[in-house]
């Protein structure tokens, strides 16, 4: 029921996985919102508790994504209606996916999960999948450039000016070199839910209302918008998710003055993929606090554990997540809530 608090009914669809473990009819004690899709392994429908689960599903009729496994053929004869059918891209080759997509098309919308490379993504779509899910886009696919492009370099200059508390007129002069930067910055601030009583109209207005520290975190997002990579929107969404998740996970564990730095650490964690430039080169051009640089370079420091937990959340490894969360003293409920809040936050942003 906590899902409704952070992902209100009527918002974008969200998939909720039951994981590989078995589940039973008690799952339906939860009244899933209409925009929530429950991911369910086919084996659950023919397990010892399968008949009770089937009866509950037919009574409540939640939106389902049935994950195809060796028991799927039998599970599909149970009468349970599925909107989606999920296929693990690691288990099937291209020919198998084509055959399965054709055979199950009338039973549900085909989605490929655990897609590991851009080539695998293209293959899944060519095989007849309607959509594909994976984190393949977070890894740079080409050799890094030797330097930042002019647009990226100007954003770094603005960031350095804000971090050093430069005069507003000096920062405004830098912003005027690329009007799109000011536009994007104001759009981010006005859609980010600061709870402001008025719309921010200019950089000077933003400084007066928010202060340099808060502005610094939103300026950090502009580096990603300078990317021309077709995967940039997905990368930006993921960077925002990591940024907000790290901030939420650290709540009560670090001083509040460090929240913005944790946000920036997450936001910058995909700069190499977004900018096509090695992370070392980007950091050399910026004046970042040492804990941020250390975490991004994998050198440890007090932000490293929060970044590692954010990265673990993108892997289908419950044990790894549990171990990382336990190291920080976080319960499963705390982690799950922070994860959904971060996802909702990233989804609300406009790129």
Predicted feature descriptions by range:
Residues 1, 6, 95-351:
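Conserved alpha-helical "signature site"
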Residues 1-56, 210-211, 234, 252:
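Bacterial c-di-GMP phosphodiesterase EAL domain
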Residues 19, 24, 32, 41-42, ...:
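Short, solvent-exposed coil/turn linker segments
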Residues 30-138, 258-261:
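The catalytic core of metal-dependent phosphodiesterases that act on cyclic dinucleotides
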């Amino acid at each position: 029921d906590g899902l409704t608090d952070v992902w209100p009914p009527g918002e974008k669809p969200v998939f909720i996985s039951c994981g590989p473990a078995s589940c039973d009819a008690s799952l339906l004690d939860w009244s899933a919102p209409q925009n929530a899709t429950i991911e369910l392994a086919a084996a659950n429908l023919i397990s010892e508790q399968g008949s009770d689960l089937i009866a509950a599903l037919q009574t409540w009729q939640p939106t389902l994504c049935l994950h195809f496994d060796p028991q799927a053929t039998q599970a599909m004869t149970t009468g349970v209606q599925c909107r989606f059918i999920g296929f693990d891209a690691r288990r099937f080759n291209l020919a198998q996916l084509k055959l399965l997509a054709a055979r199950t098309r009338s039973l549900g919308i085909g989605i490929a999960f655990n897609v590991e490379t851009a080539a695998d993504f293209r293959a899944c779509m060519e095989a007849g999948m309607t959509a594909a899910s994976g984190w393949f886009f977070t890894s740079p696919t080409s050799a890094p450039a030797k330097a930042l492009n002019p647009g990226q370099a100007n954003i770094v200059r603005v960031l350095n000016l804000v971090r050093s508390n430069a005069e507003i007129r000096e920062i405004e002069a830098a912003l005027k070199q690329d009007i799109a930067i000011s536009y994007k910055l104001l759009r981010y601030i006005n859609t980010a839910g600061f709870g402001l009583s008025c719309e921010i109209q200019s950089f000077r207005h933003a400084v007066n209302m928010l202060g340099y520290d808060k502005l610094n975190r939103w300026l950090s997002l502009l580096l990603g918008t300078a990317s021309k990579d077709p995967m940039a929107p997905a990368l930006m969404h993921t960077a925002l998710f990591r940024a907000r998740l790290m901030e939420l996970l650290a709540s009560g564990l670090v001083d509040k003055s460090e929240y913005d730095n944790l946000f920036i650490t997450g936001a910058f964690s995909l700069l190499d993929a977004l900018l096509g430039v090695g992370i070392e080169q980007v950091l050399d051009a910026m004046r970042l606090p040492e804990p941020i640089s250390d975490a991004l370079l994998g050198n440890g420091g007090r932000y490293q554990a929060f970044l590692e937990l954010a990265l673990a959340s993108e892997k289908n490894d419950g044990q790894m997540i549990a171990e990382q969360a336990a190291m920080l003293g976080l319960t499963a409920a705390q982690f799950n809530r922070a994860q959904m809040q971060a996802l909702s936050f990233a989804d609300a942003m406009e790129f």
